[in-house]
């Protein structure tokens, strides 16, 4: 699976997480819900492990990626991707939104002008073929554009700021590559909702909420803008209005956990959190123990690289297991 660079990505922790889950479950645990899917790494891994999956996220870019995972790769999609990758930006009569907003043409440096034009022309052509492809194929193509565009972004990881000079990866020509090349079908139900209001039933509910006050809507807004442009805001980045998660607010996070635990029906909740999160380990154990037996596993993990020099290398990653009485 091609992926976007993501704060809090579980790419390096997914094997550990699923190993810990397997120690506590048996063959009757067939349904896996990923309530904060983000880059969809955990949804993808659960599908690889043959779970029936539910995937949810508040952010539109994540919803598009998870829907892209529903779609099997095919010769038809391969041909479309090759055709779109070969498009010549010289055929663009009028510069597109990304070019005029997020490249030097718009006095911003999220993408080179050439790559911004490629994003625009591919996005425009995906929209033109919307009536000729299925909904899943359409989302597959959009998701492929997001991961391809993200591979040439001129930022550290997030889109909260762009770099003053183009880095080497940003100067490369964007290759329009498929989100994945899995040709088999999967069982995946998708949602674009607040996790506190998600009334679903599952065996395993995996919860990977924001750990702190960083709003993902602000940090990845450019991906949403590629999908559906909104009026840009003032300031250097042109940040538009965006969705805000209550899990990023110190005053609301505990109540948000309570609402989620009450509204989601699961046999086992598996919750990722860390020593730098808004709630302490003790606070989490006290809160979660109100709903069932709570167990916590701790592992040292490398800090997000942009923060290493300021506060050291390691952070404690917590994995809380809450066994719900049936």
Swiss-Prot record:
Induction behaviour: Expressed in the early phase of the viral replicative cycle.
- Pfam families cross-referenced by the UniProt entry: MethyltransfD12
PROSITE patterns, from UniProt? N6_MTASE (PS00092)
**InterPro entries (UniProt xref):** Ade_MeTrfase_dom_2, DNA_methylase_N6_adenine_CS, MeTrfase_D12, SAM-dependent_MTases_sf
Per the UniProt entry, what are the Gene Ontology biological process annotations, in alphabetical order? Answer: DNA restriction-modification system; methylation
Gene Ontology molecular-function annotations = DNA binding; site-specific DNA-methyltransferase (adenine-specific) activity
The chemistry this enzyme catalyses reads:
a 2'-deoxyadenosine in DNA + S-adenosyl-L-methionine = an N(6)-methyl-2'-deoxyadenosine in DNA + S-adenosyl-L-homocysteine + H(+)
Q: Which UniProt keywords apply?
A: DNA-binding, Methyltransferase, Restriction system, S-adenosyl-L-methionine, Transferase
What the entry lists under Gene3D superfamilies is as follows: Adenine-specific Methyltransferase, Domain 2, Vaccinia Virus protein VP39
Protein name, entry field: Type II methyltransferase M.CviAII
Tell me which family the UniProt entry assigns to this protein.
Answer: Belongs to the N(4)/N(6)-methyltransferase family.
UniProt pH dependence? Optimum pH is 8.5-9.0.
| Enzyme Commission designation | 2.1.1.72
């Amino acid at each position: 699976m091609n992926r976007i660079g993501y704060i809090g990505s579980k790419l390096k922790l997914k094997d550990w997480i699923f190993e810990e889950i397997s120690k506590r479950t048996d063959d009757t645990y067939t349904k896996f819900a990923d309530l904060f899917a983000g880059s969809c790494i955990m949804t993808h891994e659960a599908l690889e492990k043959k779970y029936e999956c539910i995937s949810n996220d508040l952010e539109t870019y994540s919803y598009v990626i998870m829907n892209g995972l529903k779609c099997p790769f095919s010769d038809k999609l391969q041909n479309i991707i090759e055709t779109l990758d070969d498009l010549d930006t010289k055929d663009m009569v009028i510069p597109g939104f990304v070019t005029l907003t997020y490249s030097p043409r718009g006095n911003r440096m999220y993408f080179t002008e050439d790559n911004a034009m490629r994003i625009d022309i591919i996005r425009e052509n995906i929209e033109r073929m919307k009536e000729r492809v299925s909904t899943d194929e359409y989302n597959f193509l959009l998701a492929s554009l997001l991961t391809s565009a993200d591979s040439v972004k001129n930022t550290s990881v997030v889109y909260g700021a762009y770099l003053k000079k183009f880095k080497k990866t940003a100067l490369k020509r964007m290759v329009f590559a498929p989100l994945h090349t899995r040709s088999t079908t999967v069982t995946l139900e998708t949602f674009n909702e607040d996790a506190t209001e998600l009334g679903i039933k599952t065996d395993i509910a995996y919860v990977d909420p924001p750990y702190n006050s960083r709003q993902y809507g602000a940090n990845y807004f450019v991906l949403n803008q590629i999908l559906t442009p909104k009026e840009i805001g003032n300031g250097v980045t042109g940040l538009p209005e965006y969705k805000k998660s209550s899990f990023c607010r110190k005053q609301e996070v505990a109540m948000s956990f309570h609402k989620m635990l009450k509204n989601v029906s699961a046999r086992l909740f598996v919750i990722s959190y860390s020593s730098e999160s808004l709630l302490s380990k003790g606070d989490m154990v006290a809160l979660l123990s109100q709903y069932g037996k709570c167990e916590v596993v701790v592992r040292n993990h490398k800090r997000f690289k942009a923060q290493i020099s300021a506060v050291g290398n390691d952070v404690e990653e917590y994995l809380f297991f809450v066994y719900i009485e049936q």
